[in-house]
């Protein structure tokens, strides 16, 4: 009889994400125990559970009572701040857990921390999952994208719960077993890196349309609404159209124009760029988006630079660049440039996942990654279905850029893409994401690059040797001596 009263699963960490995920689980018919070190959050969650449909949520006020209220083998989700708080929570809960029980960390954790915790958990006979959760507060409550990696046994213990709780799309729930070790956290990290790129590219489209095209916020709202009905249909494009419509409560006009132009960040974009560098994977669009966040933080320096350079004679070119612009054509060009740039950004993210999968032996299914990102998550977009199909057609696809369907689209959008970047440059408007994407495309598609000169330079000053195009082997040349002889 005792087991009847036990919860199916537990969740510790009741900030908004934790509360919403717990209520989502309960809403799907799974009795859940909840715990938070600050006990007022437990009461808050219980109040919400009552108000949102008398959901089966049991509040617990100590680690011991919490753990013992869950049926064996116990599965406990932790949603606390990454780093030391996770270790502290694990320590408090594992004291009362038994071999075969499972801990699931749902935070944005560095993947190597997850791999360390897997080893530590195994010593106690515990199972461990590092699970990326994307979708923000709304996604956690109504259906997120879930990326669990680690113990396959632990995944199977909660698979039925995760599949009901996750966002649902036409080809299934937005969750799959990612792979061993810290793969779930790594995939979520790359998701966030792609998200950085997406947001940067959208902000550049906005900048060009507003400052070169002279479009109002009302016009921008309509344009993004229209774009969200086509190839650019996505969560980020949808919310952007909403943002342009919100009026300022404290004054005239729209709120977006009153927001300080300094972008915050929590570190996952930086981790993505660092991992790309470690694995020798080119990810210039994601890197450019990170650099832009750093530069946005230099507000005082940027204002001073604008003043100093104006005094030095730099003239504002936006006005001259915008004169005579065909608005209709510009809008369509920007749409095409945004789409082509996005393909490059996603290609970079997917290539990073593949490189890490090869290094770690995770055997990541890139088509499945695209599928579970189709719903619930921040980067959900209609064209993820086409990315899924590209990897289903060819699991060993070197890059999305060379998938036959995407290749045609890139070629079709080239002229518009170049016009937008050229116009922005002539207007003095920075579009680092679009420029990085275009440079990536142009570099990747060239059969021969000027890297031959770089190799010659390296050989001259460092005797690093070089290869030839016409015969095998490594060669070294006494460049300076031969150059002087020929003078």
Curated annotation (Swiss-Prot):
Its EC number is 1.1.1.44. Its main location: plastid. The keyword Phosphoprotein does not apply. The keyword RNA-binding does not apply. Keywords: Acetylation, Chloroplast, Cytoplasm, Gluconate utilization, NADP, Oxidoreductase, Pentose shunt, Plastid. NADP(+) binds at residues 13-18, 36-38, 80-82, 108. GO terms for molecular function: NADP binding; phosphogluconate 2-dehydrogenase activity; phosphogluconate dehydrogenase (decarboxylating) activity. Pathway: Carbohydrate degradation; pentose phosphate pathway; D-ribulose 5-phosphate from D-glucose 6-phosphate (oxidative stage): step 3/3. Belongs to the 6-phosphogluconate dehydrogenase family. This is 6-phosphogluconate dehydrogenase, decarboxylating 3, chloroplastic. It comes from Arabidopsis thaliana (Mouse-ear cress).
